[in-house]
Amino acid sequence: GDDVSLAARLGALLSTLRERPGVRLRMEPGIYHFYPQGLPLHRWNISNHDACGGQAAGLLLEGFRDFTLDGGGSRWVFHAQMLPCRVAHSSGVRLENLSLDLARPVYSEGVIREVRPQRMTVWIDPEKYPWNVENGRLVFTGENFRRAMHLWLEMDAKTRAPAWGTEDLYFCTETQKVGLHPAIKAAAGDLVQITLKGGEHFFAGSRAGNRLVFRHHPRTAPAVYAADSKDICCENIRVHHAAGMGFLAERCENVTLKRFDVTPSPGTGRCFSAAADAAHFVNCGGKVALEGCRFENQLDDGLNVHGFYAVVRG
């Protein structure tokens, strides 16, 4: 249900189970909304993500052994700035049978209505993706953000893949100094008009009817984040959106993703799933296995496995 205290109450329950290896906790089917109210804020240095200050975790499993959380087919929806699931300093943890999404995606979408070499008209649903034009910039708002669009990616209306003959298109903002300098204005009917200047022009492959994915938010949190843990398994998990990667493990040993899908949320019409890689492994050892997973429309790599350089202090 839509209860702002749900995450805090779940955390209190989990604290009583930490010292009881072998517990299986099963959720009833349904839709659960998670809010950061009443939760402690943490500053995690998450590999390949942007620093964002403190953030709360919806599900926080630290120091658990042989623990299973069965979502029972439930759907978890996260509000404001939250890291949905974190597993750390644990072993034998299983997460299964649930889907993860954000109430307000950290990216937005629009549909091209008209396109010329230097002018484009785009329709943006103000209910799904609240927006306005401020000081000549296209600004999107959410429960915890107000940010100017700095980049878009055009998606083919039929294939829902990046449109042929286009690529990432960058726009200048207060923090991004390289890119186009368009004149942007709002028009009637929830339309926005983007007019380029001088010798700037839109890609020849741009077409009316195609969708634009607007980027306007930093990469702040994966949907599932595992750190310093061993023998971790995620099975029958669906990540529909995340403010970063779908799954990220660092300094872990023996990790299995089985039917771990990163796909756009059904019925939303979205052309994007995770804001970055579907799955990412950093400095992990043992066996890393992916079985029967489906990754689509994430906005970076499907799978990335690597180490990193770090400073060792004696």
Where are these regions (language model features)?
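Extracellular beta-strand-rich solenoid/capping regions of secreted or surface-exposed proteins
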Residues: 11-18, 34-68, 77-96, 104-120, ...
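Conserved catalytic-core segments centered on acid/base and nucleophilic motifs
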Residues: 237, 246-248, 279, 290-296
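Acidic/polar low-complexity surface segments
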Residues: 33-59, 103-220, 259-282, 298-314
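Acidic Gly/Asp/Thr-rich repetitive segments characteristic of extracellular carbohydrate-active
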Residues: 1-25
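All-beta strand scaffolds that present successive hydrophobic residues in beta-strands
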Residues: 27, 67-71, 92-97, 208-209, ...
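A structural signal for short, well-ordered beta-strand segments and their strand-loop junctions
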Residues: 25-28, 70, 86, 247-249, ...
